[in-house]
């Protein structure tokens, strides 16, 4: 059976006690906006009374919509809770991996020669000739499995940390712990390294400190960290030294950020994080010149 639709009955008409869309249905309820009689099927609950389908459509059509540009500005503005930094880091890693793929990397085995990987990877004691690699090393990955695991970990750890710390502190934590991972490789391993796992271990270390401060049980975090450290140590081809270096720096920065969280200590916090970065860079430079 198909419901028929007829024009609204004028005010005062005897049909006023029948739904304007379904004349065979008696009703004593009217739309709060236009006064049309509407049956239960045609009623949409409003803040005051009920509305008919036409008034609902008109209201939706006239509702102001924010342009895409405005939505983007709101998303990236300081103070936004959207994890833009985390998603940006993941996006850069994916783009770099695709560039590696099209320039010679075998994404399944990690074999092949890619100039992108070669130019962005970190080589021990090479900070003087390729200083950018202490940053770009975080965006290079060797295989599908490598980038999949790291990006999942970055998403799981990065989103809550970015919302807790804010975008600027989160990025500072990521990149400084990444330098800490490079220091671990520079002093205790003599092989090129790629991947964001060292920085992710740094995020995990800081997350443990913040979770303990908030009274959250950290047993599961300890288990995750221990298992991944063990995997890195016993499975060949994984730079566990980077994991340890990033983790140590992450724990230290976690304490620093907590101790200087008050607004009045903002300058102390900035100076402290910058100081840690300078010490790490000095260690790399000294090791390269030794």
Q: What are the functions of these language-model segments?
A:
Residues 95-99, 180, 184, 188, ...:
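Alpha-helical membrane-inserting segments
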Residues 126, 133, 224-248:
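Short alpha-helical packing/oligomerization segments
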Residues 1-78, 234-290:
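C-terminal transmembrane module of polytopic alpha-helical membrane proteins
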Residues 30-38, 116-125, 144-145, 168, ...:
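Hydrophobic alpha-helical transmembrane segments
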Residues 162, 212-216, 260-267:
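Membrane-interface helix-boundary motifs at transmembrane edges
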């Amino acid at each position: 059976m198909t419901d028929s639709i007829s024009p609204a009955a004028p005010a005062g008409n005897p049909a006023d006690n029948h739904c304007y869309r379904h004349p065979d249905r008696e009703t004593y309820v009217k739309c709060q906006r236009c006064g049309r009689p509407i049956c239960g099927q045609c009623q949409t609950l409003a803040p005051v009374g009920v509305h008919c389908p036409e008034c609902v459509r008109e209201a939706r059509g006239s509702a102001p919509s924010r342009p895409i540009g405005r939505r983007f500005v709101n998303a990236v503005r300081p103070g936004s809770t959207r994890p833009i930094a985390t998603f940006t880091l993941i996006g850069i890693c994916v783009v770099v991996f695709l560039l590696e793929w099209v320039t010679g990397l075998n994404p399944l085995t990690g074999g092949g020669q890619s100039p992108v990987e070669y130019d962005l990877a970190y080589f021990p004691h090479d900070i003087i000739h390729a200083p950018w690699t202490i940053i770009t090393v975080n965006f290079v990955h060797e295989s599908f499995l490598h980038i999949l695991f790291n990006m999942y970990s970055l998403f799981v750890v990065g989103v809550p940390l970015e919302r807790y710390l804010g975008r600027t502190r989160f990025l500072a934590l990521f990149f400084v712990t990444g330098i800490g991972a490079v220091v671990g490789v520079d002093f205790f391993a003599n092989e090129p390294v790629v991947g964001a796992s060292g920085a992710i271990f740094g995020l995990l270390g800081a997350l443990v400190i913040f979770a303990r401060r908030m009274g959250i049980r950290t047993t599961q975090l300890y288990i995750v960290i221990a298992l991944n450290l063990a995997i890195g140590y016993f499975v060949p081809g994984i730079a566990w030294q980077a994991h340890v270096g990033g983790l140590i720096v992450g724990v230290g920065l976690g304490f620093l950020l907590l101790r200087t969280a008050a607004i009045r200590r903002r300058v102390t916090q900035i100076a402290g994080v910058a100081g840690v970065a300078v010490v790490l860079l000095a260690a790399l430079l000294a090791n390269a010149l030794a």
